[in-house]
Amino acid sequence: MLEGAKLMGAGAATIALAGAAIGIGNVFSSLIHSVARNPSLAKQLFGYAILGFALTEAIALFALMMAFLILFVF
């Protein structure tokens, strides 16, 4: 019973990974659209895109860490 609840909790925690994947897709989609509109700002926009990617990926890593904590610690 407890093992099943742990698996369900870990599965629910990994749903955030799908949201992070969508967010990363939106970041780079916006980068492509912005560079297409103004190619002279490509280097500056790429830096902002990498920052957005890192922040979005950090949320995914926190969610993955929570899933592993649910599975192996609690």
UniProtKB/Swiss-Prot annotation:
Listed GO MF terms: ATP binding; lipid binding; proton transmembrane transporter activity
Protein name: ATP synthase subunit 9, mitochondrial
Function description: This protein is one of the chains of the nonenzymatic membrane component (F0) of mitochondrial ATPase.
Highest rank taxon of the organism: Eukaryota
Intracellular or extracellular location(s): Mitochondrion membrane
GO term, biological process aspect, one: proton motive force-driven ATP synthesis
Transmembrane stretches, start-end: 8-28, 50-70
Keyword set, alphabetical order: ATP-binding, CF(0), Hydrogen ion transport, Ion transport, Lipid-binding, Membrane, Mitochondrion, Nucleotide-binding, Transmembrane, Transmembrane helix, Transport
Residue numbers marked as site, Reversibly protonated during proton transport: 57
Membrane topology: Multi-pass membrane protein
CC annotations in GO: mitochondrial membrane; proton-transporting ATP synthase complex; proton-transporting two-sector ATPase complex, proton-transporting domain
Entry similarity comment: Belongs to the ATPase C chain family.
Main location: mitochondrion
Pfam families in alphabetical order: ATP-synt_C
Oligomeric form and interacting partners: F-type ATPases have 2 components, CF(1) - the catalytic core - and CF(0) - the membrane proton channel. CF(1) has five subunits: alpha(3), beta(3), gamma(1), delta(1), epsilon(1). CF(0) has three main subunits: a, b and c.
